[in-house]
Amino acid sequence: MSELPFLSPEGARGPHNNRGSQSSLEEGSVTGSEARHSLGVLNVSFSVSNRVGPWWNIKSCQQKWDRKILKDVSLYIESGQTMCILGSSGSGKTTLLDAISGRLRRTGTLEGEVFVNGCELRRDQFQDCVSYLLQSDVFLSSLTVRETLRYTAMLALRSSSADFYDKKVEAVLTELSLSHVADQMIGNYNFGGISSGERRRVSIAAQLLQDPKVMMLDEPTTGLDCMTANHIVLLLVELARRNRIVIVTIHQPRSELFHHFDKIAILTYGELVFCGTPEEMLGFFNNCGYPCPEHSNPFDFYMDLTSVDTQSREREIETYKRVQMLESAFRQSDICHKILENIERTRHLKTLPMVPFKTKNPPGMFCKLGVLLRRVTRNLMRNKQVVIMRLVQNLIMGLFLIFYLLRVQNNMLKGAVQDRVGLLYQLVGATPYTGMLNAVNLFPMLRAVSDQESQDGLYQKWQMLLAYVLHALPFSIVATVIFSSVCYWTLGLYPEVARFGYFSAALLAPHLIGEFLTLVLLGMVQNPNIVNSIVALLSISGLLIGSGFIRNIEEMPIPLKILGYFTFQKYCCEILVVNEFYGLNFTCGGSNTSVPNNPMCSMTQGIQFIEKTCPGATSRFTTNFLILYSFIPTLVILGMVVFKVRDYLISR
């Protein structure tokens, strides 16, 4: 086959070419002084058990079949080299990276071995050795690029000097050509920020802060235009030249990138069809009778050649046989034998360097918590809409109540009791819901960030949860005081300053409980909309059972009465009822005494309503406060446990 103009290796790599198939770990380093490293993957297979039918079909759901996602995959790569893993969707590219990085969940069966410098790593060592960049870039949108990297450095590295972090961040900003956007916001779809390519480089920069020697990137060019994708790949090639191992999965690379990669691997249905240098690829497929046509993109040509066409049964059988032929030819080729020889050789060399773990000198638990708290606070404080809604959403609800009730009366004929009961019912029912709205809107992004950063070993998920809780407390207190100050005095509730304080404290608790209950559920349920529905259902149910406003508690069935003791609404309602009705005197028209002929005027004092609705609540006032506020630390501790379990399940 005639050599194509864009396939010339000299124009792409020149003297930096480092593609030898034989191991060169004992020949020196890429940079002349640093030790060379190697990564070997030997006969890695992964299978999972899938249920035959859907969950509602009990018979077929009980039946399982084993699905082989990876089948005896073997790779070898050294420092200074970049490997590109090609394959169509579902070919096993991401699963292979997960297997190499130790991130595969234990719900499947993993076989085979992964060696770094000839040493087989334990599962708990992969996180400290391999840097893994996922497809999606997850950032806090209101932070600048410099702040994002600085907080990451502060979470990963211990130092008593601020200059240390500044120098570390400046170094990676320069290395990845991000200095010109260092002080720009990351941004999101709501407001502009840096470009997609720059976001990808920020993700890479965050990984470089710990100086990893093995970097893996899953689809780093997804969603980028051709020119930006080309720049990202060239950047990764340059990073590999600095004594790093770089492995990337790419779905559809440009032809100009063909000779920039030192190794190219092709996966089809979990089987390795080829793995070698670009020159070896051209020769291998040429010998198999499939030369790349002139002026064709070799990536596209070989991807089509090694894919199974499922448009028709005949084409599927034909293309699958071709793939099986190519896979068999590769396993019998000298290229495959050299891979296995290199892996075996590195396992027995005595002069190999130590395993290249990332820089690991993390700060203490409380230092990390402080960094997370500062980061969360700075990010959310810059979002004006978030700050305003946090402070005034309760007030907006209160204004509707004011416009509706105007001012409560002491005249029984004008609904003195009914208006107060309706008001308290709305207050206890709505405040948890506003707390839930805060958590549903703000925490999912923090959860996504913590899911990614905790897998990188920066901190544990419960620490992010606790940072959010500490951040939310002052906002909730201020918002409740603003709401109470306007509503309490405007609506004409019991005119006493101490009662106003009790009123505010009683409404702060359900607001926090609603928000923290939502956090607990967000640790168990991924979809925020489902969490929204669950919290709303629990809030309404608790209000019906525990308040005593809809049905007298003494007349409830015993199971519901017992269940009411586990609802925070019971204690909150009793506090508010005592706080408002104790010492209150009613009138009936112009009379201060009861009118026997008028059932609406049967009460003259608020204590009568207390004993009818919440018997004994007056003597339990302090106890109710203690029980009500005990829900808050209970939910926080439960949330920490849930996120600890979430951490474990994601890493399984």
From Swiss-Prot:
Q: Which GO terms describe its molecular function?
A: ABC-type transporter activity; ATP binding; ATP hydrolysis activity; ATPase-coupled transmembrane transporter activity; cholesterol transfer activity; metal ion binding; protein heterodimerization activity
Give the positions annotated as glycosylation sites.
585, 592
Annotated gene: Abcg5
- Please list the tissues where expression of this protein has been recorded: Detected in liver (at protein level). Expressed only in liver and intestine.
What is a biological process (GO) this protein takes part in?
response to xenobiotic stimulus
UniProt keyword RNA-binding, yes or no? no
Task: Identify its protein family.
Answer: Belongs to the ABC transporter superfamily. ABCG family. Eye pigment precursor importer (TC 3.A.1.204) subfamily.
Its recorded name reads ATP-binding cassette sub-family G member 5
PANTHER family of this UniProt entry? ABC TRANSPORTER G FAMILY MEMBER 28 (PTHR48041), ATP-BINDING CASSETTE SUB-FAMILY G MEMBER 5 (PTHR48041:SF113)
Q: What lineage, starting at the top, does this entry show?
A: Eukaryota, Metazoa, Chordata, Craniata, Vertebrata
